């Protein structure tokens, strides 16, 4: 089968398309034919692993993903595809089922096939288990692959922030994969009033997703006078600072919470994907895809994501089979 291999850490050029052996599922595993995956920020961080191993985060990351090179040379954390073979002890899936999944630190999605356990649990400290369920019938494989990463982080932080109906929520970096998901979940699931911070070029996009107010960070360095927020989600992370981000810290209510996506250890549960599928079927959630690349152009896709200017998600089409969308 074809797979994109990463045998050392570095720039996008370390990603190489190769022919590798097609995996065979064990008794509790399924073989998934991958139709689409996505290039996430986490994929790029792993590929370009730069933290020194003496640094606490660098050491822990080395344990999880590999010190001198990726433990699994096939990166990629999200997929949408079709089950081709099931192990003899698998009970919930059968050949022909269309699924979408988050493979966590198992990675392996930059390939035509992957074996995943029917049910997964952490294998060692810091490991993020895989999660898989049936693909939303109203979505293409590309759309389904696009939404998995955002929900894995957005829902974790919104839950941690105890967001609920009527609260004022501020999302900094609202036009990326995490931000576009957080806007929709905060508005349509939790019933919050949502203020989105993004560039003016993306204002129309985030408003169409449900944002009640939009602040253009390229033109504003302060928040509306007197406005206070119950929850602020920094969907960009601490690596980027600005006067406007500082103002977000200062605009919390007395019991307000500020959370950044680069702090914590998010885990995705099957229940999260089921909630997402429910919102999709009800027309309350949609995928946001910026660009789509073929598997052969993986390095180019990584270069684009590295710019930090993508809107929503960058998707990789792995298999171009026809698919039915109801």
Regions found by a protein language model. Give the residues of each.
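Residues located in well-ordered beta-strands
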Residues: 2-4, 16-21, 33, 81-82, ...
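Glycine-rich beta-strand-centered segment in the early N-terminal region that forms part
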Residues: 21-38, 51-105
């Amino acid at each position: 089968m074809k797979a994109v291999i990463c045998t050392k850490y570095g720039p996008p050029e370390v990603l190489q398309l190769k022919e590798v052996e097609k995996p065979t599922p064990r008794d509790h595993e399924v073989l998934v034919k991958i139709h689409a995956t996505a290039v996430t920020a986490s994929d790029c961080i792993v590929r370009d692993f730069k933290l020194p191993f003496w640094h606490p985060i660098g050491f822990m990351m080395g344990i999880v993903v590999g010190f001198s090179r990726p433990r699994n040379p096939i990166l990629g954390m999200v997929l949408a595809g079709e089950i081709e073979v099931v192990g003899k002890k698998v009970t919930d899936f059968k050949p022909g089922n269309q699924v979408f999944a988050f493979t966590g630190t198992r990675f392996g999605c930059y390939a035509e096939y992957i074996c995943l356990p029917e049910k997964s649990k952490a294998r060692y400290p810091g490991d993020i288990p895989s999660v898989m369920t049936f693909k939303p019938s109203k979505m293409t494989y590309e759309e389904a692959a696009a939404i998995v990463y955002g929900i894995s982080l957005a829902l974790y932080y919104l839950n941690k922030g105890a967001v609920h109906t009527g609260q004022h929520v501020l999302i900094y970096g609202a036009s990326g994969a995490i931000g576009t998901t957080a806007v929709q979940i905060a508005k349509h699931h939790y019933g919050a009033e949502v203020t989105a911070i993004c560039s003016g070029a993306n204002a129309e996009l985030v408003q169409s997703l449900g944002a009640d107010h939009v602040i253009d960070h390229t033109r504003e360095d302060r928040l509306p006078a007197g406005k206070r927020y119950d929850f602020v989600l920094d969907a960009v992370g601490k690596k980027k600072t600005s006067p406007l981000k500082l103002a977000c810290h200062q605009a919390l209510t007395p019991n307000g919470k500020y959370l950044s996506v680069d702090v914590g250890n998010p885990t995705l549960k099957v229940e999260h994907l089921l909630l997402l599928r429910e919102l999709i079927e009800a027309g309350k959630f949609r995928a946001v895809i910026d660009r789509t690349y073929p598997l052969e152009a993986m390095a180019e896709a990584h270069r684009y994501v590295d710019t930090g200017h993508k809107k929503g998600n960058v998707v990789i089409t792995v298999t171009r089979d026809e698919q039915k969308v109801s």
